A protein has these predicted regions:
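N-terminal glycine-rich FAD/FM-binding segment characteristic of electron-transfer flavoproteins
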Residues: 1-258
Length: 258
């Protein structure tokens, strides 16, 4: 069984998040960069299966800037056998469509029986990458699973719905996405951290994947301008000298708030 886990470097949830007003992209220097927690949970699903099924190979795949290699290597420290990182300046600011095309090509290069990813990243929260990657790969999908069972020929799981829960099954090869209902990821130990330095880590470009991300090659969204939200006004302070109630009522009526 060859399992590919899609992981992503994101700004630390507990740090500051800022936009670069010149580029409209996230300011990567504003906070510490970490491996997305939902991606770690997806990796835990794969590693737990590998622990119980010797011979299973787990590979982490990510599309990220060159300096993100150290973050992605955490996946190797956790237990993945290898990593593949797509690095290319042309991918800065890539939309969901481009991201899905590139990740699908990277997954094909790595080889797979099952692809696992988180349902929502903590920065973009698009929630569609799993389905889009599956479409590009031409394989079944099962998304937003709160429980997963991996078999030799199929993968099944539980998806929460407004009416309760639905049981879904997909024949392998397939793509699935998981929710935060799945267990927390394991912590890398010292042995794993040291071993990660010697594990295969392949860095590829768009040319290596034979993917063209020129806007003319496929429909995509491009940010043309971004501006900072203007600060709120200071408001009006009412001092109570016996007539504060009347002043407040007049203010609410004037601004159509009452």
């Amino acid at each position: 069984m060859k399992i590919v886990v899609l992981v992503k470097e994101v700004p630390d949830t507990y740090g500051d998040r800022k936009l670069n007003l010149e580029t409209g992209l996230a300011d990567r220097a504003a906070s510490e960069r970490v491996l997305d927690e939902i991606g770690e949970r997806a990796l835990e699903v794969a590693l737990s299966y590998a622990d119980a099924n010797p011979g299973t190979e787990v590979t982490v795949v990510s599309m990220a800037p060159e300096e993100s290699a150290a973050t992605i290597r955490k996946g190797l420290a956790m237990g993945a056998a290898s990593a593949l990182q797509v690095v290319d300046p042309a991918l800065a600011g890539a939309d969901l469509g481009v991201t899905a095309r590139v990740l699908a090509a990277a997954v094909q290069r790595a080889g797979f029986d099952l692809v696992i990813t988180g349902n929502l990243s903590t920065d973009g929260a698009g929630g569609v990458i799993a389905a889009m990657v599956a479409e590009h790969l031409g394989v079944p999908q099962a998304t937003a699973l709160s429980a997963v069972t991996i078999g030799e020929t199929e993968v099944s799981g539980t998806r929460a719905t407004d009416a309760g829960a639905a049981q879904v099954t997909a024949t392998l090869p397939a793509v699935i996405s998981i929710t935060e209902a799945l267990p927390d990821a394991r912590f890398p130990n010292f042995k794993g951290i040291m071993a990660a330095k010697k594990k295969p880590f392949e860095t590829v470009s768009l040319a290596d994947l034979d993917v063209d991300v020129d806007p003319a090659s496929a429909p995509q969204s491009i940010m043309t301008a971004v501006s900072e939200k203007p600060p709120r006004g200071a408001g009006i302070k009412i001092t109570d000298e016996g007539g504060a109630g009347e002043k407040l009522a007049a203010y609410l009526i004037e601004n159509r708030l009452a």
